Amino acid sequence: MRTEYCGQLRQSHVGQQVTLCGWVNRRRDLGSLIFIDMRDREGIVQVFFDPDRADALKLASELRNEFCIQVTGTVRAREEKNINADMATGAIEVLASDLTIINRSESLPLDSNHVNTEEARLKYRYLDLRRPEMAQRLKIRAKITSFVRRFMDDHGFLDIETPMLTKATPEGARDYLVPSRVHKGKFYALPQSPQLFKQLLMMSGFDRYYQIVKCFRDEDLRADRQPEFTQIDVETSFMTAPQVREIMEAMVRQLWLEIKGVDLGDFPIMTFAEAERRYGSDKPDLRNPIELVDVADLLKSVEFAVFAGPANDPKGRVAALRVPGGASLTRKLIDEYGNFVKIYGAKGLAYIKVTERAKGMDGINSPVAKFLTAEIVEAILERTGAQDGDMIFFGADNKKVVADALGALRLKLGKDLSLTDESKWAPLWVIDFPMFEDDGEGGLTAMHHPFTSPKDMTADELKAAPEEAVANAYDMVINGYEVGGGSVRIHRGDMQQTVFGILGINEHEQREKFGFLLDALKYGTPPHAGLAFGLDRLTMLLTGTDNIRDVIAFPKTTAAACLMTEAPSFANPAALGELGIQVVEKEAKASLENK
């Protein structure tokens, strides 16, 4: 039906007859002439109808926005005064000789001249996706997956599919469960990741695997999370962690060159401990120059319990955050930032405004200055590198609260005060994460997942001191987003059972949930390591949006609902009966529980 795409016409096509298919983006009726901007997935071209083609001109008078049409005509060069430099096709236009209205459109529920609500965009997603910016995002997503497949094929990786209907295994979030009709009372789980299957593929001898795969997690949603998401999943045998990082870094660097024309350079490597200490985050945005600076040793003897308490507590921390030019912040803004850090558990925000450092105590303004000596203030200013016009904020609490609160404040200040250089790309690897973290109930939970290997520890050493264990894990971070994460996996049965035991999974549960894995580990399992990238997050970065729903064709809301199809929906009672499932209403359930 077409010979060319609208958006691909150029001056090289001048004089050629073309047939185009697409939609009316805009129509301008000048009486004897009618102009339309005609759109398809590749872009927009101007088409005009003149009196010499009376039938086409008459039919064109009926055109309205979003009519689906076919046009045949001749490509002509525009007069120089009419060239539109803002359009890729702005140097040419198409003189229409034939017009077919394929399908008419009713008045649109979306307004192309105004910003539509996200609810409206999601409800009429098929119309929202017609917008050029949305089409461009999905085209870039397609380019990313195409590039990844080429790269992986060139490096000897095999694309192998793993099951969608599998067994529920604890991986940190709730599973989406699928009832079995054949095995009544039993359920499949949709995979949170192909983690165990890709490890089993390594045990099967497929030493380089990849898959671009859908994953599912029934968790509380955030702006950058979806219940179903796509991973670029990778696993290798007989490769060390540095070797895995090297090949995956090469892939991402080449991807950025292909999509953005940018060389990211070598990725710096930072330990988890350093990232938390300097940036209050395990995914630091290195475009932001603000850093956390420890000052507890300077404040142990002050007569100010807010500082002295954490400064003398082994589990406490006092850190300073120097904000260049921050002395200009108003009291109202300072109070707002104080309320902001309370979200992260901080009790407030002490500060020092540096107006004229050379004047010592007379050159600062601070509500806590009365508790500090001139020597302590000078030491703080020296350590933080404070200059005239700077602001120093303080966090004093347990280590986690200080890191979380000042880390979040750092990001907010970077954005609010335009300190973060958004023209740059800042990738890095974060390594050496703690193996376990406190689960809040006196036990331990895996910081990544239960199949991550500890670094340089035997099973006996791990059992004796699990809190000291460092995971052989690594995350790739770009501009403050974790775009990929992975680890060296456990490949010995005794180590895997030790980790399960530390996590409170008894032997019976181990056999019930992971018996197939423990059995597989008995038969010459090779050392293996891998990584998974979030395709959605990569696409967000490469398209310049901060909303994950902008890079997914048909996303869910933050309530895990599809406004277009109205999913989830109630199931047919007969279908539920076949599955052996009965829906219990809340009132009935409450009465049963009260009996």
Swiss-Prot record:
Q: What class of enzyme is it?
A: ligase
The family database entries (PROSITE patterns) matched by this protein are listed as: AA_TRNA_LIGASE_II (PS50862)
Q: Where does ATP bind?
A: R217, D218, E219, Q226, E482, G534, L535, D536, R537
Pfam families in alphabetical order: GAD (PF02938), tRNA-synt_2 (PF00152), tRNA_anti-codon (PF01336)
Which subcellular locations apply to this protein? Cytoplasm
GO molecular function annotation: aspartate-tRNA ligase activity; ATP binding; nucleic acid binding
Q: Which GO terms describe its biological process?
A: aspartyl-tRNA aminoacylation
Can you state which reaction this protein catalyses?
tRNA(Asp) + L-aspartate + ATP = L-aspartyl-tRNA(Asp) + AMP + diphosphate
Where is the segment annotated Aspartate?
195-198
UniProt entry keywords in alphabetical sequence = Aminoacyl-tRNA synthetase, ATP-binding, Cytoplasm, Ligase, Nucleotide-binding, Protein biosynthesis
This protein's GO cellular component annotations are: cytoplasm
- InterPro entries of this UniProt entry? Aa-tRNA-synt_II, aa-tRNA-synth_II, aa-tRNA-synth_II/BPL/LPL, Asp-tRNA-ligase_1, Asp-tRNA-ligase_1_N, Asp/Asn-tRNA-synth_IIb, AspRS_core, GAD-like_sf
**This enzyme's EC code(s):** 6.1.1.12
Detail which positions bind L-aspartate.
Answer: E171, R217, H448, R489
NCBIfam families, per database record: aspS_bact, PRK00476.1
Q: How does it assemble?
A: Homodimer.
Return the PANTHER family for the record. ASPARTATE--TRNA LIGASE, MITOCHONDRIAL, ASPARTYL/LYSYL-TRNA SYNTHETASE
User: Can you tell me which family this protein belongs to?
Assistant: Belongs to the class-II aminoacyl-tRNA synthetase family. Type 1 subfamily.
Q: What does this protein do?
A: Catalyzes the attachment of L-aspartate to tRNA(Asp) in a two-step reaction: L-aspartate is first activated by ATP to form Asp-AMP and then transferred to the acceptor end of tRNA(Asp).
* The protein, known as: Aspartate--tRNA ligase
Which organism was this protein described from?
Klebsiella pneumoniae (strain 342)
- The gene designation is aspS
